Amino acid sequence: MKFVLLFGVLSLTLFSYSSAEMLDDFDQADEDELLSLIEKEEARAKECTPRFYDCSHDRHSCCRSELFKDVCTCFYPEGGDNEVCTCQQPKHLKYMEKAADKAKKFGGKIMKWFS
């Protein structure tokens, strides 16, 4: 009976130790993957396409405005057969940015009143 109990405790200890090492390996792999994704995103952010420039080569490369990312919009010019794609800001997002800017300015004025 003592042998079975000792064997059970020993196997449980070894199992928990191996599980902990496996979890550490998984955590390290997740951390490395996250760092590589962040580096790729930073590199991609440096190569963004400015507003009203051609984005037909990569439709997800448009730059961000203050709050929102611009959208690659494609259209056919009048009398033309070739599709033209440019980075543009949708009107509803433009209005939302203007409203947020005005709210920020108004909030600054209120803070000055109470200072």
UniProtKB/Swiss-Prot annotation:
Disulfide bonds join C48-C63, C55-C72, C62-C87, C74-C85. This is U3-lycotoxin-Ls1e. GO terms for molecular function: toxin activity. Residues 1-20 form the signal peptide. The presence of a 'disulfide through disulfide knot' structurally defines this protein as a knottin. Residues 21-44 form a propeptide. It comes from the Eukaryota. Keywords: Disulfide bond, Knottin, Secreted, Signal, Toxin. GO terms for cellular component: extracellular region. It is found in: Secreted. Belongs to the neurotoxin 19 (CSTX) family. 01 subfamily. Expressed by the venom gland. InterPro entries: Spider_toxin_CSTX_knottin, Spider_toxin_CSTX_Knottin_CS.
